[in-house]
Each structure stands twice: as C-alpha cells, then as structure tokens.
UniProtKB/Swiss-Prot annotation:
GO biological process: immune response; inflammatory response
Alphabetical UniProt keywords: Cytokine, Disulfide bond, Growth factor, Inflammatory response, Secreted, Signal
Compartments in which it is found: Secreted
Pfam families: IL8
MF terms in GO: chemokine activity; growth factor activity
Protein name per the record: Growth-regulated protein homolog alpha
Record-level GO cellular component terms: extracellular space
C-alpha cells in the first residue's frame, strides 16, 4: 500500500500546485486595473465650468472604445468632470487651455 501512496503523491502535488496557480492568476486578473476600458468614460456631461477651477483638460477623440468626443477636465480639487464638447462655453475653455499651453 505504501508504494501506491507514494506514486499518487506527485500527481496530487502537481494537481494542487496547478489549482493554486489558477486561483492566483484569476485573482490577479479580477483585481488588475483596466488601463483603457472599452466604453465611454463620460456618462453625463456639464455644459461648462469656471475656468479658474480647471487644472487641465483632456480631449479624447472617437475610437473603437467610444464613438463620441470626450472632454474631461481635471479640477484643482482633484476631481474630474466630463464636459459637453459641443457646448459654446466648453469650446471657449478648450481654446483658452490650448492657447495657455502654447504660450508656455
């Protein structure tokens, strides 16, 4: 009986190691941050915000992840807000931020 038990031990050990490896890989995949999500980031947009509250503006063009142009403003408070890219006030904000960036 001892020889059969010792023959099964390596198979059992390999199966246990494989199971632990799969569990660890699954947890890493579930907890890993997604760099570029395959959806639009802006579900709601603001028509405008005061320029003095904005630290930077990021414009994302349409692509496979989202069919809309997205304007995301980073505020001085650390928050991010989505702005309506077709709103007149937002267009002025983008122009001012671009002019500010090109002047520096």
């Amino acid at each position: 009986m001892a020889p059969a038990a010792t023959a099964a031990a390596p198979r059992l050990l390999r199966a246990a190691m494989l199971f632990l490896l799969l569990v660890a890989a699954g947890r890493r995949a579930a907890g890993a941050p997604v760099v570029n999500e395959l959806r639009c980031q802006c579900l709601q947009t603001l028509q405008g915000i005061h320029l003095k509250n904005i630290q930077s503006v990021k414009v994302t063009t349409p692509g496979p992840h989202c069919d809309q142009t997205e304007v995301i403003a980073s505020l001085k408070t650390g928050q991010e807000v989505c702005l309506n890219p077709t709103a007149p006030m937002v267009k002025k904000i983008i122009d001012k931020m671009l002019n500010k960036a090109s002047a520096n």
